[in-house]
């Protein structure tokens, strides 16, 4: 009797089924890991923007620290943003919708709030107006949103930070004009 080399049809089918099961398990895990990393990039970039805004506040004497009831808004275009220009998906950060807002609290503490919006032709994605405290939590990646409505305009930003309407004279904006 001659010895046969090779696999039977049953053996080949078994290998294909096993590989299919492995793929069904592996692909969703890889996709969720990539999405989690993209969200972590937004949170990291938002924290970098706050750090750069703090540096800008220390080095630029033209910018006043806010008094109680006031807001200082530093737009992305005004802050020396270093290497933070695009998000992990290649979207450019919007210069008018991305900013850091400083709020003076009742206990003489300056709160930093950030909004970071990456835009392309069809959608936006980023971190809606959020406090530095919230960005420091382990759940910060849950703050990243897709196709959200950014908080824009002095009045809306002031209202979002204080929960009430603030006089336009108490909101100071700093942005570079082209």
What positions do the PLM features span?
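Short, compositionally biased strand/turn segments
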Residues: 1-7, 63-66
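N-terminal single-pass transmembrane signal-anchor helix
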Residues: 3-30
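Low-complexity, S/T/G/P-rich flexible repeat/linker segments used as non-globular hinges
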Residues: 122-178
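Membrane-proximal N-terminal amphipathic helix
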Residues: 38-63
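Extracellular/periplasmic head regions of type IV pilus-like filament subunits
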Residues: 61-133, 137-139
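Structural motif detector for alpha-helix initiation sites
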Residues: 9, 73-76, 168
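Sec-dependent signal peptide cleavage junction
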Residues: 26-42
């Amino acid at each position: 009797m001659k010895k046969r080399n090779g696999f039977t049809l049953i053996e080949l089918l078994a290998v294909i089924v096993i590989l299919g099961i492995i793929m069904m398990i592996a692909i969703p895990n890889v996709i969720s890991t990539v999405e989690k990393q993209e969200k972590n990039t937004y949170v990291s970039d938002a924290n970098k923007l706050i750090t750069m805004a703090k540096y800008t506040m220390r080095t630029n004497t033209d910018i006043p620290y806010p008094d109680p009831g006031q807001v200082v808004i530093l737009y992305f275009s005004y802050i020396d943003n270093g290497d933070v220009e695009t998000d992990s998906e290649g979207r450019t950060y919007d210069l008018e919708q991305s900013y850091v807002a400083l709020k003076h609290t009742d206990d003489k503490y300056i709160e930093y709030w950030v909004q970071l919006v990456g835009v392309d032709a069809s959608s936006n994605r980023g971190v809606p107006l959020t406090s530095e405290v919230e960005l420091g939590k382990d759940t910060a990646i849950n703050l990243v949103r897709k196709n959200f409505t950014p908080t824009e305009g002095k009045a809306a930003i002031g209202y979002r930070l204080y929960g009430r309407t603030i006089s336009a004279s108490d909101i100071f904006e700093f942005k570079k004009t082209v």
